[in-house]
Amino acid sequence: VGSEMCIRDRDRPVCRTIETRYFIKETMEELINLLHTGGYSCVIDNEGKIRTFTQRGVADLYDLLTREPEFLKGALIADKVVGKGAAALMILGGIKELYTDVVSSNAMDLFRTSDVKVDFVQEVPFIWNRDHTGWCPVETMCSEEESAEAILQLIRGFLERIKNKE
């Protein structure tokens, strides 16, 4: 990028910011496209390494956070549906940016306490459960919790109970 393309802030060129922002925008658009055309539930990019996921719920994010937390640090995520539980895991993982088709109001409240940049198509009062008869169980379980750390403990217990039933 030539200097004529740079923005100056107190006589400092900030070309890198422009280049980085352009790269992130382009990468996020690619992730969103992959999310929708590949039939994935979640797509994550960290420094050019892209992973795709197909499980419903928070299991994939929980596994990443507890087994490979470095992959979430600074990552870009495109996801179809994000409730408060997923939001907590993303915040604790230190993601940089999220695009989601649908986000719950409770998730947005939690994101507002973080540095995560969030773009979405639709904000809804809550996330439905799988058969659309009520709230998602993770959304219900997390609804009154204020901290991402407390939500992590709730999710850990929830996933352990599911695993023990199998």
Give the location of each predicted region.
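Conserved mixed alpha/beta catalytic, RNA-binding, or beta-rich assembly cores of soluble enzyme
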Residues: 28-101, 123, 128-137
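C-terminal binding/interaction regions
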Residues: 108-165
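N-terminal charge/polar-biased segments
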Residues: 24-45, 50, 144-166
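Short, polar loop motifs at secondary-structure junctions
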Residues: 102-107
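Short, small-residue-biased leader/transition segments that mark boundaries at the very start
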Residues: 1-7
